[in-house]
């Protein structure tokens, strides 16, 4: 099932909620939406508590490389992932995709994730 996406320019916040089986193509569509809205520098909150991974480590590695290449000319804002601790592979996926040098953190509660994001700065550029 796709990631439901909400982009709020006033708050400079992107919220994604995934349910069902999450595939790499759905993650790619989510990222395309963020990029086309010019919201890469916004804070991002992704809730994956109600989904399961529909991909393997090889797909994650390949997709992370694509994102790394695309990131070279863009600024990225902080990323908060809300995940079920029993399904840590999804949290690991998003922190892997965030890559080095980007601020990403995993939370058990959406409230803690929002609190952390509110403390993070976002570029105006």
Give a label for each model feature.
Residues 1-125:
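Amphipathic, Lys/Arg-enriched alpha-helical "gate/interface" segment within cytosolic domains
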């Amino acid at each position: 099932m796709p990631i439901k996406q909400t982009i709020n320019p006033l708050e400079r916040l992107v919220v994604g909620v995934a349910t069902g089986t999450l595939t790499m193509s759905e993650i790619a569509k989510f990222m395309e939406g963020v990029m086309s809205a010019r919201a890469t520098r916004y804070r991002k909150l992704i809730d994956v508590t109600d989904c399961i991974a529909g991909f393997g480590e090889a797909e994650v590695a390949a997709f992370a490389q694509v994102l790394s290449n695309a990131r070279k000319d863009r600024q990225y804002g902080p990323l908060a992932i809300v995940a079920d601790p029993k399904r840590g592979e999804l949290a690991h996926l998003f922190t892997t995709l965030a890559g080095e040098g980007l601020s990403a953190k995993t939370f058990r509660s959406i409230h803690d994730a929002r609190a952390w994001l509110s403390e993070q700065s976002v570029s105006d550029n």
